[in-house]
Amino acid sequence: MVLTNSKQPRKQRKALYNAPLHLRNSVMAAMLSKELKEKFNKNSLPVKKGDTVKVLRGNFKGIEGEVSKVDYAGYKIIVEGVVNKKQDGTETAYPIHPSNVMITKLDESDEKRFKNSSN
């Protein structure tokens, strides 16, 4: 999905910042695992709550967990098990950009999500 036709980075960024929520879904796509790529004939799908993902980049690389929240306003996802420990001992969820994760298991409760796939 194209938000703008411009090549200029400043206009690309502006289009992302000002995009309506219903168009942000396509930007929130993550790579699929090899098994899911073969099954659905797609390289990536938008991340949804309930999907299981594996973190590929950053301090939490290698952690696998279920997506508990998708923040379309901030282009971030919250994954169970990816937490930041604060000085007082409390743990807070650490938001991750969907481009830094790989979907390993899909939440298949929504039939409309797969209506255009080959299966």
Swiss-Prot record:
Gene3D superfamilies: 2.30.30.30
InterPro entries: KOW, Rib_uL2_dom2, Ribosomal_uL24_CS, Ribosomal_uL24_euk/arc, Ribosomal_uL24_KOW, Translation_prot_SH3-like_sf
GO molecular function: rRNA binding; structural constituent of ribosome
Gene Ontology annotations of biological process type: translation
Swiss-Prot/TrEMBL keywords: Ribonucleoprotein, Ribosomal protein, RNA-binding, rRNA-binding
A Gene Ontology cellular-component term: large ribosomal subunit
Family assignment from sequence similarity: Belongs to the universal ribosomal protein uL24 family.
Record note on quaternary structure: Part of the 50S ribosomal subunit.
Function: One of two assembly initiator proteins, it binds directly to the 5'-end of the 23S rRNA, where it nucleates assembly of the 50S subunit.
NCBIfam families named in the record: rplX_A_E
Name under which the protein is recorded: Large ribosomal subunit protein uL24
Lineage per the UniProt record: Archaea, Methanobacteriati, Methanobacteriota, Methanomada group, Methanococci
